[in-house]
Amino acid sequence: LYSQKLARAFVVLDPETRAQSIWHDATTQAFALGLEVVEDAGLLAEVAGLVEWPVVLMGEIGIDFLALPAEVLQTSMREHQKFFSVKNPKTGRIERFITVANNAPQDGGTLILKGNQKVLSARLSDAKFFWENDLRRIQANGLEGMGAGLSAVTFHNKLGSQAERIARIATLAAHLAPMMDVDPERAILAAK
Protein backbone atom coordinates (compact mmCIF):
# COMPACT_ATOMS: atom_id res chain seq x y z
CA LEU A 1 0.00 0.00 0.00
CA TYR A 2 0.99 3.59 -0.69
CA SER A 3 0.65 4.70 2.95
CA GLN A 4 2.87 1.81 4.10
CA LYS A 5 5.56 2.77 1.57
CA LEU A 6 5.41 6.33 2.83
CA ALA A 7 5.66 5.15 6.44
CA ARG A 8 8.83 3.23 5.58
CA ALA A 9 10.16 6.54 4.22
CA PHE A 10 9.18 8.29 7.49
CA VAL A 11 6.07 10.02 6.17
CA VAL A 12 2.69 9.74 7.90
CA LEU A 13 0.21 10.46 5.13
CA ASP A 14 -2.93 11.25 7.13
CA PRO A 15 -2.86 14.62 8.97
CA GLU A 16 -5.40 13.36 11.52
CA THR A 17 -3.11 10.44 12.36
CA ARG A 18 -0.21 12.88 12.76
CA ALA A 19 -2.34 15.07 15.05
CA GLN A 20 -3.39 12.10 17.18
CA SER A 21 0.22 10.96 17.45
CA ILE A 22 1.39 14.44 18.46
CA TRP A 23 -1.32 14.82 21.09
CA HIS A 24 -0.80 11.32 22.50
CA ASP A 25 2.96 11.72 22.80
CA ALA A 26 2.73 15.26 24.19
CA THR A 27 0.19 14.38 26.87
CA THR A 28 2.10 11.22 27.79
CA GLN A 29 5.35 13.13 28.29
CA ALA A 30 3.60 15.83 30.32
CA PHE A 31 1.70 13.29 32.45
CA ALA A 32 4.98 11.53 33.30
CA LEU A 33 6.08 14.76 35.02
CA GLY A 34 2.71 15.49 36.64
CA LEU A 35 1.99 18.25 34.12
CA GLU A 36 -0.72 18.94 31.52
CA VAL A 37 -0.53 20.13 27.93
CA VAL A 38 -2.74 23.18 27.36
CA GLU A 39 -5.29 22.16 24.74
CA ASP A 40 -5.06 24.08 21.48
CA ALA A 41 -6.87 22.40 18.59
CA GLY A 42 -5.86 25.11 16.11
CA LEU A 43 -2.18 24.80 16.91
CA LEU A 44 -2.41 21.00 16.83
CA ALA A 45 -3.92 21.08 13.34
CA GLU A 46 -1.33 23.60 12.18
CA VAL A 47 1.64 21.65 13.52
CA ALA A 48 0.25 18.36 12.17
CA GLY A 49 0.19 20.05 8.77
CA LEU A 50 3.82 21.17 9.06
CA VAL A 51 5.46 17.82 9.80
CA GLU A 52 5.55 14.50 7.96
CA TRP A 53 6.98 12.31 10.73
CA PRO A 54 6.16 13.98 14.05
CA VAL A 55 8.54 13.54 16.96
CA VAL A 56 7.42 15.24 20.17
CA LEU A 57 10.06 16.85 22.39
CA MET A 58 9.57 18.60 25.72
CA GLY A 59 11.73 21.57 26.65
CA GLU A 60 12.14 23.75 29.69
CA ILE A 61 11.33 27.41 30.05
CA GLY A 62 14.10 29.47 31.62
CA ILE A 63 13.61 30.22 35.30
CA ASP A 64 13.71 33.97 34.57
CA PHE A 65 10.44 33.68 32.66
CA LEU A 66 8.35 31.43 34.90
CA ALA A 67 6.81 34.41 36.71
CA LEU A 68 5.35 35.84 33.50
CA PRO A 69 1.57 35.47 33.19
CA ALA A 70 0.45 32.28 31.46
CA GLU A 71 -1.12 34.32 28.66
CA VAL A 72 2.18 36.04 27.87
CA LEU A 73 4.05 32.73 27.78
CA GLN A 74 1.37 30.97 25.73
CA THR A 75 1.14 33.75 23.16
CA SER A 76 4.90 33.97 22.71
CA MET A 77 5.26 30.22 22.35
CA ARG A 78 2.19 29.62 20.19
CA GLU A 79 2.40 32.53 17.79
CA HIS A 80 6.13 32.76 17.27
CA GLN A 81 7.43 29.24 17.81
CA LYS A 82 4.43 26.91 17.31
CA PHE A 83 5.09 25.40 20.76
CA PHE A 84 2.45 23.88 23.00
CA SER A 85 2.32 25.15 26.57
CA VAL A 86 2.73 22.67 29.40
CA LYS A 87 1.34 23.72 32.77
CA ASN A 88 1.49 22.57 36.33
CA PRO A 89 -2.14 21.74 37.22
CA LYS A 90 -1.53 22.59 40.89
CA THR A 91 -0.26 26.12 40.28
CA GLY A 92 -1.64 26.86 36.80
CA ARG A 93 1.85 28.07 35.84
CA ILE A 94 3.32 27.32 32.43
CA GLU A 95 6.57 25.48 33.19
CA ARG A 96 7.58 23.71 29.99
CA PHE A 97 6.86 23.56 26.28
CA ILE A 98 6.30 20.92 23.64
CA THR A 99 7.86 21.22 20.21
CA VAL A 100 7.44 18.82 17.32
CA ALA A 101 10.41 17.81 15.19
CA ASN A 102 9.94 16.59 11.64
CA ASN A 103 11.95 13.39 12.06
CA ALA A 104 13.60 11.35 14.78
CA PRO A 105 16.80 13.20 15.72
CA GLN A 106 19.96 11.13 16.16
CA ASP A 107 20.72 12.65 19.57
CA GLY A 108 17.22 12.17 20.99
CA GLY A 109 16.38 15.81 20.40
CA THR A 110 19.07 17.39 22.58
CA LEU A 111 20.35 19.72 19.88
CA ILE A 112 16.84 20.67 18.71
CA LEU A 113 15.74 21.46 22.26
CA LYS A 114 18.89 23.46 22.95
CA GLY A 115 18.27 25.58 19.85
CA ASN A 116 14.56 25.98 20.57
CA GLN A 117 15.22 26.97 24.18
CA LYS A 118 17.73 29.58 23.01
CA VAL A 119 15.26 31.10 20.52
CA LEU A 120 12.44 30.94 23.07
CA SER A 121 14.60 32.71 25.66
CA ALA A 122 15.13 35.57 23.21
CA ARG A 123 11.39 35.80 22.52
CA LEU A 124 10.52 35.65 26.19
CA SER A 125 13.16 38.26 27.04
CA ASP A 126 11.32 40.63 24.72
CA ALA A 127 7.96 39.67 26.20
CA LYS A 128 9.29 40.14 29.74
CA PHE A 129 10.68 43.56 28.85
CA PHE A 130 7.34 44.76 27.46
CA TRP A 131 5.36 43.21 30.32
CA GLU A 132 7.54 44.85 32.97
CA ASN A 133 7.54 48.14 31.07
CA ASP A 134 3.73 48.11 30.91
CA LEU A 135 3.52 47.35 34.63
CA ARG A 136 5.82 50.29 35.43
CA ARG A 137 3.72 52.60 33.26
CA ILE A 138 0.51 51.44 34.94
CA GLN A 139 2.02 51.90 38.41
CA ALA A 140 3.18 55.40 37.50
CA ASN A 141 0.13 56.63 35.59
CA GLY A 142 -2.70 54.16 36.19
CA LEU A 143 -4.55 52.31 33.45
CA GLU A 144 -5.93 55.53 31.98
CA GLY A 145 -2.39 56.85 31.62
CA MET A 146 -1.64 53.95 29.28
CA GLY A 147 -4.12 55.37 26.81
CA ALA A 148 -2.89 58.96 26.96
CA GLY A 149 -0.72 58.71 23.87
CA LEU A 150 -3.32 56.95 21.76
CA SER A 151 -4.72 60.19 20.35
CA ALA A 152 -1.49 60.46 18.35
CA VAL A 153 -1.85 56.93 16.93
CA THR A 154 -3.97 56.64 13.79
CA PHE A 155 -6.44 53.76 13.82
CA HIS A 156 -7.65 54.39 10.28
CA ASN A 157 -7.38 57.54 8.18
CA LYS A 158 -11.19 57.74 7.82
CA LEU A 159 -12.00 56.60 11.37
CA GLY A 160 -9.61 58.69 13.42
CA SER A 161 -7.16 57.85 16.17
CA GLN A 162 -6.96 54.88 18.51
CA ALA A 163 -8.27 57.16 21.28
CA GLU A 164 -11.37 57.99 19.20
CA ARG A 165 -11.86 54.30 18.47
CA ILE A 166 -11.68 53.49 22.19
CA ALA A 167 -14.19 56.25 22.97
CA ARG A 168 -16.61 54.73 20.44
CA ILE A 169 -16.15 51.27 21.96
CA ALA A 170 -16.73 52.69 25.46
CA THR A 171 -19.97 54.35 24.31
CA LEU A 172 -21.12 51.09 22.76
CA ALA A 173 -20.17 49.15 25.92
CA ALA A 174 -22.19 51.57 28.08
CA HIS A 175 -25.18 51.11 25.78
CA LEU A 176 -24.97 47.30 25.78
CA ALA A 177 -24.11 46.82 29.47
CA PRO A 178 -27.68 47.06 30.86
CA MET A 179 -28.84 44.42 28.36
CA MET A 180 -26.32 42.04 29.91
CA ASP A 181 -26.96 43.05 33.51
CA VAL A 182 -23.56 44.75 33.78
CA ASP A 183 -22.84 48.09 35.42
CA PRO A 184 -22.35 50.63 32.57
CA GLU A 185 -19.48 52.37 34.42
CA ARG A 186 -17.58 49.08 34.72
CA ALA A 187 -18.22 48.36 31.03
CA ILE A 188 -16.80 51.77 30.10
CA LEU A 189 -13.73 51.17 32.27
CA ALA A 190 -13.22 47.73 30.70
CA ALA A 191 -13.56 49.20 27.21
CA LYS A 192 -10.82 51.73 27.91
For each feature predicted by the language model, list its residue ranges:
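Amphipathic alpha-helical "coupling" segments that flank catalytic cores
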Residues: L1-K192
